[in-house]
Design a protein with these regions (language model features):
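Substrate-binding/access-modulating region of protease and related hydrolase catalytic domains
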Residues: 1-105, 170-188, 199-202, 243-246
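Outer-envelope exported proteins of Gram-negative bacteria
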Residues: 64, 134, 209-213
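Flexible loop residues that form catalytic
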Residues: 26-29, 113-116, 216
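Internal, charge-rich low-complexity segments
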Residues: 69-84, 140-151, 157-160, 218-228
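Short amphipathic alpha-helical segments
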Residues: 46, 187-191, 207, 211
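C-terminal subdomain of the subtilisin-like protease fold in secreted/lumenal serine endopeptidases
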Residues: 18-25, 198-262
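Flexible, glycine-rich phosphate/dinucleotide-binding loops
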Residues: 30, 70, 117-120, 159, ...
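Extracellular S/T/G-rich loop segment that most often corresponds to the catalytic His/Ser-adjacent loop
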Residues: 59, 87-198, 247, 254-258
């Protein structure tokens, strides 16, 4: 989704006082928007204002961390954008003046993904100060298919879909498919936030976020803290943080029972 569509959707959410919004996307065309670039700085400003507008009207904003296996607290390169027009991708250096939208915006709940083994999914991005909670996203290397993936709704309307390695039914209407990605994780967290809102309709957006995090099941860093899930293909991922909060898992795994009954 490009800037105008993202801004319009956030303003709509605020105007209609939606309870929870899930955002399983990054704002096209840039994975990282860098504030030293005038055009990208304008994108950051516009989407930040729209997000703040929605939050001020009680909307709980939840976002996927992304599937690039990047430490968002220490980004180095962006190799996948701009993603439009197709084929225009370039490799560029990025730093902490560059952010992924919308998940690095203030007040947005950032969600990483874990696989069936309970470990960080091999593709999940993460980062200190960015990761708030974690949720199931699938991770095909941790269990045989289809159990290494998540059964999720999938629209098959529009042009034919060809996704290597994914079981997608090419038929009219909505179907289900075994997929993986932090796009599967953030809806779990958004669903738990919705349970909190249902149990406490007058609770503020900030209080819902706090409850979501404080009722999560804590997850410590793995031993060893450095992992190399794809033997160098994605680089080494290093878990940092102490008991109760890490850059891999934030406050921990979302807990629907604890959150809904709290």
């Amino acid at each position: 989704f490009f800037t105008q569509e993202v801004v319009d959707a956030m303003i709509y959410a605020g105007d209609h006082h939606l309870d929870v919004v899930n955002m399983s996307f990054f704002a096209d065309p840039w994975l990282f928007n860098c504030k030293n670039d005038a055009d990208q700085r304008a994108i950051v400003t516009a989407i930040s204002r729209a997000s703040r507008y929605a939050q001020q009207r009680g909307v709980v904003m939840v976002a996927a961390q992304g599937n690039e296996a990047i430490d968002l607290a220490h980004p180095v390169t962006d190799e996948i954008s701009p993603d439009f027009p197709p084929g225009s991708e370039l490799t560029r250096e990025v730093g902490n003046n560059c952010v992924v939208l919308p998940n690095e915006l203030p007040g947005v709940v950032g969600v990483t993904g874990i696989g069936p083994s309970g470990e960080l999914s091999f593709f999940s991005s993460y980062g200190a100060g960015v990761t708030d909670v974690t949720a199931p996203s699938g991770s095909s290397g941790q269990a045989p298919n289809p159990f290494g993936r998540v059964l999720a709704a999938w629209s098959s309307t529009g042009p034919p879909i060809d996704l290597p390695g994914r079981d997608v039914q090419d038929a009219g209407g909505a179907v289900y498919a075994w997929v993986q990605g932090t796009s599967m994780a953030s809806p779990h967290a958004a669903g738990v936030a919705a349970l909190i809102r249902a149990a406490h309709p007058s609770m503020s957006a900030g209080a819902v976020q706090a409850t979501l995090q404080n009722t999560a099941m804590p997850k410590d860093c793995p031993t060893p803290a450095e992992t190399d899930p794809l033997s160098g293909a994605l680089g080494v991922q290093t878990c940092t943080g102490g008991p109760g909060h890490t850059n891999f898992y934030g406050k921990g795994l979302v807990d629907a029972l604890a959150a809904g009954s709290g």
